[in-house]
């Protein structure tokens, strides 16, 4: 993959861009195998990968420059702006959208935030595309509500230029820190959920809910989880740290007793919407802390699926699972190092199979799916 900004030394987000892609996969697989070297693994499956470019469904753009000539991209270490509108990780559909958005910023008078001077209003633009129908979700991250009325007044022009804009919102982030978004989200369109579909399973993305940024590989990850669960004829399961419910909704059959737990209420609203659309009657989702929920339960299902943030599931949940001993633990991780530490704490379990999913080409990061079975 060629990137002009990488070649010029202005962007190093893709740290491994100089490394041939087959070597990237081999290095990631070696890293994963070394982390689990102390455990017996029954089956290592070949890594799953997708496109090497144009695979991202989301852009996080720092807004800089002036209101008349805004720049979208990132800030270099020395504070100079780097234009990322032509980033090869984005689909071709994004660049013309960015062109319109630059014009809109000028029309609406949305002054870009200046980090050095701590002045201005528009900090970020967050753009997400649905691979299901091509609709877009756009979030304006503002320092305050000062320019909100101007933004709303100018929206009809933007919606006319970009009819695929289905979900628009403003996020208020008043803190002068490298924090992407604040707690307050202001909806600017009636529709506030972007429809997506993986493997015939309807999913929804709301402004403040997490969603995988590589749809092609994410669809393979969910399909693989479903296959592994179905092979063991599981009738009851938990989906902890469930997000919008992607794993649980793929794995649950009409008779499966599924409980999905996620701290983010927006994500839970998405999961419930999907479950209702699928007609699943034995499925429930709740906006709770996953560890607190689990450790308060006196009974355990046959399978516990966990998809934690980078910190892993931690000792408290590992101790609980070891004590309660579900037949299966399906662990999906975006940080194999914390997953390996957690597995070492899960007494009484054997690693049945492991598979790497390269969600993040040209970087050292990857996702991994691991099936643990209780030793008989």
Swiss-Prot record:
Its EC number is 2.1.1.189. One of its GO terms (biological process) is rRNA base methylation. It is an enzyme of class 2 (transferase). GO terms for molecular function: 4 iron, 4 sulfur cluster binding; iron ion binding; rRNA (uridine-C5-)-methyltransferase activity. The active site is at 334 (nucleophile). SUPFAM superfamilies: S-adenosyl-L-methionine-dependent methyltransferases. Belongs to the class I-like SAM-binding methyltransferase superfamily. RNA M5U methyltransferase family. RlmC subfamily. This is 23S rRNA (uracil(747)-C(5))-methyltransferase RlmC.
């Amino acid at each position: 993959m060629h990137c002009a900004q990488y070649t010029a030394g202005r962007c190093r987000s893709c740290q491994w861009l100089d490394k041939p892609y087959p070597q990237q996969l081999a290095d990631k697989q070696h890293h994963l195998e070394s982390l689990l070297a102390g455990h017996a693994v029954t089956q290592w499956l070949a890594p799953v990968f997708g496109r090497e470019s144009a695979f991202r469904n989301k852009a996080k753009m720092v807004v800089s420059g002036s209101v008349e000539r805004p720049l979208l991209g990132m800030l270099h270490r020395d504070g100079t702006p780097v234009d990322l509108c032509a980033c090869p990780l984005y689909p071709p559909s994004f660049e013309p959208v960015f062109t319109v958005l630059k014009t809109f910023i000028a029309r609406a008078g949305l002054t870009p935030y200046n980090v050095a001077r701590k002045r201005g209003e528009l900090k970020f633009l967050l753009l997400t595309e649905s691979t299901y129908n091509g609709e877009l979700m756009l979030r304006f991250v503002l320092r305050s509500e000062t320019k909100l009325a101007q933004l709303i007044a100018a929206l009809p022009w933007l919606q006319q230029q970009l009819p695929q804009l289905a979900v628009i919102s403003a996020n208020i982030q008043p803190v002068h820190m490298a924090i992407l978004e604040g707690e307050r989200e202001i909806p600017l369109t009636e529709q506030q959920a972007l429809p997506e579909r993986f493997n015939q399973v309807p999913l929804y993305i709301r402004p403040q809910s997490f969603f995988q940024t590589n749809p092609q590989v994410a669809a393979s990850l969910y399909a693989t989880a479903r296959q592994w669960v179905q092979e063991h004829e599981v009738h009851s399961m938990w989906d902890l740290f469930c997000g919008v419910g992607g794993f649980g909704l793929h794995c649950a059959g009409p008779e499966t007793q599924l409980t999905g737990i996620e701290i983010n209420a927006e994500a839970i609203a998405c999961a419930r919407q999907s479950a209702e659309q699928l007609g699943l009657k034995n499925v429930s989702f709740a906006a709770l802390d996953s560890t607190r929920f689990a450790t308060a339960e006196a009974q355990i299902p046959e399978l516990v699926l966990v998809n934690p943030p980078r910190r892993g599931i931690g000792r408290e949940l590992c101790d609980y699972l070891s004590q309660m001993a579900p037949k299966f633990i399906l662990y999906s991780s975006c940080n194999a190092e914390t997953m390996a530490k957690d597995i070492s704490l899960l007494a009484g379990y054997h690693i049945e199979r492991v598979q790497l999913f390269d969600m993040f080409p040209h970087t050292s990061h990857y996702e991994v799916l691991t099936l643990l079975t209780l030793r008989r």
